[in-house]
């Protein structure tokens, strides 16, 4: 697996967390740099940790499934990517309705609600739950890493940094531009993961070599 593929995988996996970060920016008022930093640290940290756990589990079973490991990687990435696209399309209308309702809250109540919401949205418990939820896909992808002979340390550092940067920007973007990019990010992430899964399958079955030989 090339560095480019790892970077693209990092972007694909990070899109879920990025979308949630944008949502955080939407719900928070007057976002501060430390708010964005906190969200980014939680999401980036878990996004790096989960592939490591998956890789460890995959290594344990690697000897038993070497003959079809590329199919496992392809199926996992394809399923995860498809799920991201499906959920983004499915939830679009529901989220628009929620935003419309929140816009009707009176100014005074909105300020009071915003202060309470900030504490809740940025609590360690809330961020941990969201960080785990958005990195489950990374856990599954980590299993496929065990069959690809890559440097796991380098890989999780790349994934963690990409997620950290995107989530930091996501909170800022969420405050400035609303929910325009949220579902599009999930769709893009899903497409990237599916394409990488196809690429891994083609590489390991020798189809690419045959096409260009």
Curated annotation (Swiss-Prot):
The keyword Lipid biosynthesis does not apply. The chain crosses the membrane at residues 3-23, 36-56, 67-87, 130-150, 152-172, 187-207. Its main location: membrane. GO terms for molecular function: manganese ion transmembrane transporter activity. It is found in: Cell membrane. Keywords: Cell membrane, Ion transport, Manganese, Membrane, Transmembrane, Transmembrane helix, Transport. Coiled coil: none annotated. InterPro entries: Mntp/YtaF, Put_MntP. It is a multi-pass membrane protein. The keyword Transmembrane helix applies. Probably functions as a manganese efflux pump. This is Putative manganese efflux pump MntP. It comes from Clostridium perfringens (strain ATCC 13124 / DSM 756 / JCM 1290 / NCIMB 6125 / NCTC 8237 / Type A). The lineage of its organism: Bacteria, Bacillati, Bacillota, Clostridia, Eubacteriales.
């Amino acid at each position: 697996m090339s560095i480019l593929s790892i970077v693209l995988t990092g972007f694909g996996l990070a899109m879920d967390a990025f979308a949630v970060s944008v949502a955080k920016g939407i719900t928070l008022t007057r976002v501060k740099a430390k708010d964005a930093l906190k969200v980014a640290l939680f999401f980036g940290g878990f996004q790096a940790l989960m592939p490591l756990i998956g890789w460890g589990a995959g290594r344990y079973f690697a000897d038993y499934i070497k003959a079809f490991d590329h199919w496992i990687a392809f199926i996992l990435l394809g399923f995860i990517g498809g799920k991201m696209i499906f959920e983004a399309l499915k939830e679009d209308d529901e989220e628009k309705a929620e935003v419309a309702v929140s816009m009707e809250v009176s100014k005074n109540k909105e300020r009071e609600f915003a202060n309470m919401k900030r504490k809740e949205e940025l609590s360690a418990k809330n961020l941990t739950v969201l960080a785990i939820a958005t990195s489950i896909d990374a856990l599954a992808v980590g299993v496929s890493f065990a069959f690809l002979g890559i440097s796991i340390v380098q890989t999780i550092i790349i994934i963690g940094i990409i997620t950290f940067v995107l989530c930091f920007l996501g909170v800022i973007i969420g405050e400035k531009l609303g929910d325009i990019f949220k579902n599009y990010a999930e769709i893009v992430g899903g497409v990237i993961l599916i394409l990488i899964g196809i690429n891994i399958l083609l590489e390991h079955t020798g189809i690419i070599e045959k096409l260009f030989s």
